A protein has these predicted regions:
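Short, Lys/Arg-rich flexible segments
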Residues: 1-95, 99-156
Length: 156
């Protein structure tokens, strides 16, 4: 008859894996937040780099605007945020978005949409698309690094 002897280290390894499985959702949430933070920071930088125009400049210029007023830019920066986590099946989702209104009671989402798509009064300037594309690699690396750190903390 076959005999199986298990090294005492295997029990520790199995308990570490069980603990890791139990805490996997928390690890994924922390890692996803780190990636979202990098993308949100890049979006903030892109919005902050947009040219600022005064109301007078906008009225005098017959060309479509390429920038924002100071109030619009401040409204976008204050309305930019990261949503709460949402679990969708086996996925953990987090969204970065813009909400609220600026000092002139203009919806921030309408302003950013007019920038992304362009309108008759504003030239297309896809700041969010540009920011997310530029931050994708850094966000993926941050997620991987955070996940590795969290796993090492729990296993060792």
């Amino acid at each position: 008859m076959a005999k199986l002897t298990i090294n005492p280290g295997i029990d520790t390894y199995i308990s570490d894996l069980t603990k890791l499985y139990d805490e996997s959702e928390e690890i994924c949430k922390r890692s996803a937040y780190m990636g979202a933070k990098i993308v949100a920071d890049r979006c903030r930088a892109e919005i902050g780099s947009l040219p600022v125009e005064t109301e007078k400049q906008k009225r005098e210029n017959s060309e479509p605007s390429s920038g924002l007023t100071g109030e619009q830019r401040r409204g976008l920066l204050s309305g930019l945020g990261i949503s709460h986590f949402r679990k969708d099946g086996s996925f953990i989702n987090v969204k970065i978005g813009i909400s609220g209104r600026n000092a002139k009671n203009q919806p921030n989402i309408a302003i950013i949409r007019s920038l992304e798509s362009g309108t008759s009064f504003r030239t297309r300037n896809p700041v969010i698309t540009r920011a997310t594309s530029a931050a994708r690699g850094a966000a993926e690396q941050a997620i991987k690094k955070q996940m590795d750190e969290e796993i090492k903390k729990r296993i060792h």
